[in-house]
Amino acid sequence: MTRTIMLVPIGKNIGLTTISLSVISAMKRCKFNVKFLKSAIEYSNTNYNIDDTSLILKDTQSLSYINPLIVDFINQFSLKQIKQRIVDYILSKVYAKKEKYDIFLIEGFDTKSHTYVLSNDINYYISKSINVEIVFVCAVDRSSQLDINNIVYIINNVFKKNKNINIRGVIINELCQKVRNDYGNVNLFDMFKSSVKKINFGDVKYDFLFQKNGIEVLGCVPWIHKLMEPSVKILCDKYLGANIIYDRCMNSQYIKTFIIYDTNEDIKNAKKFHRSLLIIPAISNDKIKEICVQINKNKILISAILLTNFLNVHDKCTDFIDQLKIANCTICSTPNDVFTVVSLLHKFNFKLDNKNYQLNIIENDMSRHINLDWIRSLKHSYQYNSICLPSLFIYNLKHLAKKFMKNILLPEGCELRIIKAASICSKNDIAYCTLLGNPKKIKNIAESNNIVLNSNIEIIDPKLIRKNYVERLCHLRRHHGITLAHANELVKDNSILSTLILESKKVDGLVSGSIGTTSSIILPALQLIKTSPGSSLISSVFFMLLSDYVTLYADCAVNINPDATQLAEIAIQSSNTARLFGIFPKVAMLSYATGCSGFGDTVDKVKEATRIVQERSPNLIVDGPIQYDAAINRSVAKLKCPHSLVAGNATVFIFPDLNSGNITYKAVQRSANILSIGPILQGINQPVNDLSRGSSVQDIVYTIAVTVLQSSLSH
């Protein structure tokens, strides 16, 4: 079983690339076959359409990866559309190739130009839309409970609020960032009376602070200063915005450490100052010149000198500037004081490149701070949430339809929405579509609306084939005294003609109803195709794609007032449909009362129907009578029926009659602005599906896909 892990950053500049590479290294050490995907990156004129982690993997050829999706927050789409595009992209890349790898590692979105709240929003949407195991990545630079509490607050209030999200734990990065003071390696934050200590994996304090909130610490990666060595150009010029007084190979000089100059000491120890950025507070010009002389005299290789509180370099004489060059390093200045500079350095995003020695540090040192017990546990199967997620449901619907590619008949061939849907299905290989109607009229409608009708869309003129089905109709209805003349009249109805075409098995399924009535679809199906073995009735079900999961509503379109036996059959049919589409059925037999709290004919009918379901399908999880709020909401369920296996977790909702079912499905669909697919017909020998007259093109496409799957999977 392929495990799908997503690293979700909490905050900005947390060293996500470092952690991703460390986790990859730990996984490879445990002999896992890993595939990497960065979810998305922001469009930029300066980037190369690839993220930092993928770029390193590309340059080192160390791991298979997939290029990220490029998103443009300024010029393209709404945020909602962007989030859905990212989810669709991940699904198309990950789920199509999952079986080839042991682990799919997804790196969450981290914004460079917006607040990290945007990253949280996008990563939350991804997390709740696809079945992944979430590992949070955060940086705790100052060992304070306040800092950790803020991270825990975000996890609890942004991510944990959704019951679908699989949270595995957290990896903490950059625990011990150091800025070295002269002589003694004093931690910078000690200067400001902050107690930062080095914390190794499994530190009791970190374990306690996270685990008391139900979050397991999967790694504590200490700061390793030699890993991140920015160039003088990157750090001083681009990041700090310092004024460059003297440039000596800024691009090729790298900063190994930072040193705040101590006026009470001389610069003699070459080892301590080697490749450092020497930060000099406000002192006299003579003292600055003296420092440069000492650097030259003691042959110390300093990367750069940064003069703080340096207001205007142009006020200094040229001779003074020339005298500084004796230090043989880049000289720069800033009007900021030492404290401001240090604060900026603290926030600097040290960016990895593909230097071999940096990658060796990650592989040989940093990756060992990832909990290998967790990594090894990934070889075992993992029970993801059984809830069917909307985005995953749609992906599987289209993916499986492409796999089977059945021929679906659309008798309302001259309807614009039908023509558009057929074109989309053809373009995306969802189905072969056959349009019934006047070919010239259909082609004119398509042309005037810029719709492409591919060669695999067949158009049949019903006038040319009606006579072919007269005898068959007479045979099928022979016990009802049908005459040849009457049959000739009946086949002029496209609903009857299309049902006869399906019955002859020249097509695999039938979708109609965008301009017709439900009865005009169901009656010919009942008369000519008949109910499936073991079924005494045809019922309907709607797939309701709520914000966080998919449920089934039945019967909302066919049976007006079913009795207890019929209601039980509808429940069993609906549970079978749920299984067919990968949804684990937990059936709620709905009523206005829960358990024994109410009385009346409807309650009694639902009680009896529940008993019949339990008798006929003893392995089916079913409960009733139960109210809608108790069936769908866990909090209400705990109060009204705490011992129910269905309450709060129902996936199949059976309404007592058509009145309540039809009203509820339309109220939920319109009020919550959700997608519903249906009515999907059940209990029939061959797939026939009805469309609501208000169906959108998208609704029709999905109904066609469902019909393809019914035709394929039911056998």
Swiss-Prot record:
The keyword Manganese does not apply. SUPFAM superfamilies: Isocitrate/Isopropylmalate dehydrogenase-like, P-loop containing nucleoside triphosphate hydrolases. It is an enzyme of class 2 (transferase). Pathway: Metabolic intermediate biosynthesis; acetyl-CoA biosynthesis; acetyl-CoA from acetate: step 2/2. It comes from Buchnera aphidicola subsp. Baizongia pistaciae (strain Bp). This is Phosphate acetyltransferase. The keyword Transcription regulation does not apply. It comes from the Bacteria.
